[in-house]
UniProtKB/Swiss-Prot annotation:
Gene3D superfamilies: 3.30.160.20, 3.30.70.1660, 6.10.140.1950. It is found in: Cytoplasm. It comes from Haemophilus influenzae (strain 86-028NP). GO terms for molecular function: translation release factor activity, codon specific. Belongs to the prokaryotic/mitochondrial release factor family. Peptide chain release factor 1 directs the termination of translation in response to the peptide chain termination codons UAG and UAA. GO terms for cellular component: cytoplasm. Coiled coil: none annotated. The modification N5-methylglutamine is found at Q235. Residues 285-309 are annotated as: Disordered. This is Peptide chain release factor 1. Pfam families: PCRF (PF03462), RF-1 (PF00472). Residues 285-295 have a biased composition (Basic and acidic residues).
Amino acid sequence: MKDSIIAKLESLKERYEELEALLGDVSVISDQDKFRAYSKEYSQLEEVVKCFNRWTQLNQNIEEAEILLDDPEMKEMAQMEIEESKAEIEEVEQQLQILLLPKDPNDEYNCYLEIRAGTGGDEAGIFAGDLFRMYSRYAESKRWCVEMLSANESEQGGYKEVIVKVSGEGVYGQLKFESGGHRVQRVPKTESQGRIHTSACTVAVMPELPESEMPEINPADLRIDTYRSSGAGGQHVNTTDSAVRITHIPTGIVVECQDERSQHKNKAKAMSVLASRIVQAEQERQAAEQTDMRRNLLGSGDRSDKIRTYNYPQGRVTDHRINLTIYRLDEVMNGKIDELIQPIITEYQADQLAALSEQN
């Protein structure tokens, strides 16, 4: 491992030990904000420091074993120790490289998840509903909270568009690669001839930004419309213009929120989604200028814009970005999508490592 990387790891270990001492300090314990900040930093360093300690121990094992090579009785055991330690060192170094990759500061944030029906008419709306259930069940398995912000239901079931907020630990980092076109191939319930149809939905995932990171939005750039909610809620929603639609005129971005009975609450939620969309759109524009590696946040919803295909007759799901196919469609649609998400994250980390190697 390079000296510069070892020096970096040693400085992280020093900071970790410093934080350990600080967290036992009475003055820090009595200051909740400071204690919370130090605890978070401590937990973020824990894995990399433990990994580095293991690397140090393995190198020490090799040094001690090499001394025993001159002893005829211990030579065979020492050689075995050296071989095993060297093999593990390779694995640990790979792990350390990944742990030292630049972190996306947004990964720890909650996120907004948008699903929109694209081509395919009613069937696309039904599939949007299926995707919503898939993500909801996945969130449930992770003990995340899903909060409905806006839902435009389609006539045959499902949604023309649905927007939810997903809250929990590391939500955006886990879901961000779900953005893109999702295609379904199956025989619709409304199809009498038994023909397979292809429909599409687009998914967009955006981090919920803290107030300190939200862009300044000029009120003069906004058009705010209120209307009666079409969702559940009985008589109340039919008599109150509580739903809010905000249009950001310079970018043309439109956000609707109708989940709350209070117009004020709906407006606050819509403004938060709008801020995230504006920031994300700008980041996407900058990324497009620099590299083609990052995918567009939200495609057209056309069949050609696809990251994943769900084929019901064959019971398979294919992720086209990494040519991954699994034949457990029922499990996937019931929320077991870690085996689709983790390989994408691993591939992204490999791309980052390759880019760093080229720079060095």
